[in-house]
Amino acid sequence: SAADHTEVGRYSQYPDIFLPTTKVLSDTARKIHPELVPVVCASGDKFIADPEQKIKVHEMFDADICEMEAAGIVLTSNRNQVPCMLVKCVSDGIEGGFEEFQETMDTAADLCLEVVEKIVAGMGR
């Protein structure tokens, strides 16, 4: 940004726009649910429902998904040296909006909860 002379989407303490999560946690999640795939997640300050805006975010950051929470979670975890992973279920695609979000919300929450519960259960081993 103009204030800190870094490109849009990058925090000055990071070498690029990508915020790292804890690889071992992400790898474990994919072992639990092999259908999970790594994606580039754009994290912004507002919900984007407009398909044209979603396409712009995709083109600007090569993002597969966009949402509002990931950057805050990863930044806080990294700053406090706490392991972090993100399991995101796409609940509204580029063409979808609030209606699609409501239809898939419960299924997405159940899958995410299952992954987290299994990882936490395995931590004591």
Regions found by a protein language model. Give the residues of each.
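Short C-terminal domain-edge/linker segments immediately following a structured domain
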Residues: 3-13, 70-73, 116-121
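Generic structural signal for well-ordered, non-membrane alpha-helical segments
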Residues: 18-26, 50, 66, 70, ...
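Generic non-transmembrane alpha-helical segments
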Residues: 24-35, 76, 114-122
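A C-terminal functional module that forms or caps the active site or interfaces directly
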Residues: 47-95, 99
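His/Asp/Glu-rich mid-to-C-terminal helical/loop segments that flank catalytic regions of hydrolases
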Residues: 94-125
